[in-house]
Design a protein with these regions (language model features):
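Glycine-rich phosphate-binding loops of nucleotide-dependent enzymes
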Residues: 2-252
Length: 252
């Protein structure tokens, strides 16, 4: 059975100030898969996520979500279509309670007016969604904490809960292990993997920890100088001589 493509780029490119940042990227992401994206610093990985989420406008090509061209749409519209994202730098509201961070994310996804969300039923629906998301990532016991008091690993879990509360079809995780202690990484990896397997989400993850990527990704895309060098199964990518030379400089 052929698996449908949920996210795709066609000849996607971005030039800034005369420099080519992303060039001719053709990528098809399968519905429900876990795709890892690796590459050296400056390869264009985060820029690709910025193009996906609408923070940057490409100079060429297009982006499709579930078969529809979303290239010219603003970030909020892409979110409403089911594209969720976390960032390298923590994006939580540190002075708000953990549960309120997630509830606000749930409200933003549904896109109702303030009038709608002042109604008790609307508030309750968003709160219920927030409580569910916190349970999914193991933060229910810290729902009343001020978000700024969380450990870095728990802040990453909170960001994932905020994305889950928005009920996305596709989740973009930009270096979720950045700043997380070695001891906390395995638990965070399990949370991320469960989101894909149990909740049926499509996950794209940019990550510098190769062992994390190879442990969870079904396929890996390798970027180098703004181009896709390879897209293949984890095993094949790790044995690819071009990847070894361009990314690691030596065999894996």
């Amino acid at each position: 059975m052929t698996v449908a493509t949920i996210l795709a780029t066609r000849n996607l490119g971005l030039d800034i100030g005369g420099a080519t940042i992303v060039a001719d990227v053709d990528l098809e992401v399968r519905d429900g898969e876990f795709l890892g994206i690796i590459g050296p610093n400056g390869a264009g990985k985060t820029t690709l996520f910025n193009l996906f989420s609408g923070l940057y406008e490409p100079t060429s090509g297009r982006i499709e979500l579930a078969g529809e061209d979303i290239t010219g749409e603003p970030p909020f519209r892409r979110s409403q279509r089911g594209l969720g994202r976390t960032f390298q730098v923590s994006s939580v509201f540190p002075l708000l309670p953990v549960v309120e961070n997630v509830r606000l994310a749930a409200e933003a996804r549904i896109g109702g007016t303030l009038r709608v969300w002042r109604r008790a039923a609307g508030f309750r629906a968003a709160l219920d969604r927030a409580v569910w998301a916190l349970e999914r990532v193991g933060l229910a016991a810290r729902a009343g904490w001020v978000a700024g008091a969380l450990s870095h690993g728990d802040k990453r879990k909170l960001e994932i809960a905020m994305v889950l509360a928005s009920d996305p079809r596709v989740i973009l995780l930009d270096e979720p292990m950045a700043g997380v202690s070695v001891e906390d990484i395995p638990e965070l990896v399990e949370v991320i993997k469960s989101v894909q397997v149990q909740d049926g989400k499509t996950v794209l993850m940019v990550e510098h920890h190769i062992e994390v990527v190879t442990g969870v990704a079904e396929r890996i895309a390798v970027m180098h100088h703004g181009k896709l060098l390879a897209v293949d199964t984890t095993e094949n990518v790790m044995q690819n001589e071009q990847v070894q030379a361009a990314y690691l400089g030596e065999p894996l």
